[in-house]
Design a protein with these regions (language model features):
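C-terminal substrate-binding subdomain of Rossmann-fold SDR/epimerase-dehydratase oxidoreductases
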Residues: 1-107
């Protein structure tokens, strides 16, 4: 069987980007040493991360959002997300910040 696992949060792509930027800024304000680890980041210089966002011409067939239908997983497995979108994003971002040795060799 195949199941889609989603968070029940259907958001426009731009909202996702804005939320990521806000969470990065929040992390820089709350986590000691981030500015030293990432000195080129806008937040390390006191600038908002959203300043990195630029607008480009949409490609043909551009998706304004991506939605996952987890209805089958809910019905057959009793699945339900444990976190809302913003909390889950914050948790994911903090995991990556805490596990740089895992992802750094991949970039």
């Amino acid at each position: 069987e195949t199941y889609n696992i989603g968070g029940g949060a259907e958001l426009p792509n731009m909202t996702v980007i804005d939320t990521i930027c806000a969470e990065v800024d929040r992390a820089f304000a709350e986590v000691d040493g981030l500015a030293a680890r990432y000195p080129d980041a806008p937040a390390a210089k006191g600038e908002p991360t959203i300043s990195l966002k630029t607008f480009v011409t949409d490609r043909a067939g551009h998706d304004r959002r991506y939605a996952i239908d987890e209805t089958k997983a809910r019905a057959e497995l009793g699945y339900a997300p444990q976190r809302g979108f913003e909390e889950g994003l914050r948790h994911t971002l903090r995991w990556y910040l805490d596990h740089e040795s895992w992802w750094r060799p991949l970039v």
